[in-house]
């Protein structure tokens, strides 16, 4: 049984994988003004919908101010517990270690891009 219908996703849209134990250090390293943590799971059709949408217009989801991180909540259930998830995908937005917000479920490309660009503008102000 396949674990995803989008096996090429992380090769075509690179993100740093994080473990629950290392998340705070990654968020606090100052590598980018904002981080998006993509929480997903194997055999998750809604995660695959989001992955396909991101790949279909990858340039829209790349911002110089943003670093993407990802974690599989089935392999790292502590990530789901920490953020009180009831489903995936979920996208958590951070400025350093400060959580700015969560996008869940996948709202579609336009709404997602609009929400992130709003956070970028607010963070720059």
Predicted ranges, named:
Residues 17, 39, 63-78:
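Thiol-based oxidoreductase modules, predominantly thioredoxin-like and allied folds used
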Residues 44-47, 91:
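The canonical Cys-X-X-Cys-His
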């Amino acid at each position: 049984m396949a674990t995803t219908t989008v096996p090429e996703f992380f090769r075509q849209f690179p993100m740093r994988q994080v473990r629950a134990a290392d998340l705070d250090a990654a968020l606090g390293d100052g590598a980018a003004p904002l981080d998006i943590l993509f929480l997903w799971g194997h055999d998750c059709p809604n995660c695959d919908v989001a992955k396909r949408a991101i790949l279909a217009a990858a340039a829209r989801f790349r911002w110089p101010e943003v670093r993407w991180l990802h974690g599989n909540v089935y392999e790292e259930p502590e990530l789901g517990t920490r953020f009180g998830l009831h489903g995936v995908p979920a996208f958590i937005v951070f400025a350093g270690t400060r959580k700015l917000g969560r996008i869940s479920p996948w709202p579609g490309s336009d709404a997602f891009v609009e929400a992130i660009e709003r956070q970028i503008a607010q963070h720059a102000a």
